Amino acid sequence: MVTLHTNFGDIKIKLDFDKAPVTAENFLNYCKDGFYNNTIFHRVIDGFMIQGGGMESGMREKATKAPIQNEANNRLSNKRGTIAMARTSDPHSATAQFFINVADNDFLNYRSKEMFGREVVQEWGYAVFGEVVEGMDVVDKIKKVKTGNKGFHQDVPTEDVVITSVSIE
């Protein structure tokens, strides 16, 4: 169990080591290292998700460890209250940034290889690795904050939403 202590309250997360062992261990290691302390939720979109884990106040990006393998093919869905890894367009680029789904976001799920004409297309999706077990009221407060643009970043809270510390039990 991991608790994100924020300036809005606590969010307790149960990690799924059975279905997402690499991703859960990666997140836990960042927690143990104190990496998430004093980072911000830097992207907040009501009706979608709240994203954090990589930026400090002022949108300063933190250096991360190497990317991990995408484990989205684990039958876990991006439903409300789940936590998943953020990444770039490269399916295997997740490092430290994560998001908590504030709605059911099935379009983010892994889709198996499908035949489209002569082409086989695979939708990698975003790897879910846990679920909020306490503190969805805190997540729901965060999703309502006022946002704007900061540099080339969009949907940035106008006042910092800070992960002050993380505890592990």
Curated annotation (Swiss-Prot):
Coiled coil: none
Localization, UniProt: Cytoplasm
One family name in Pfam for this protein: Pro_isomerase
A cellular-component GO term for this protein: cytoplasm
The keyword Isomerase appears for this protein: yes
Gene3D superfamilies named in the record: Cyclophilin-like (2.40.100.10)
CDD domains the record matches: cyclophilin_EcCYP_like
Protein name: Peptidyl-prolyl cis-trans isomerase B
Record lineage: Bacteria, Pseudomonadati, Pseudomonadota, Gammaproteobacteria, Pasteurellales
Gene: ppiB
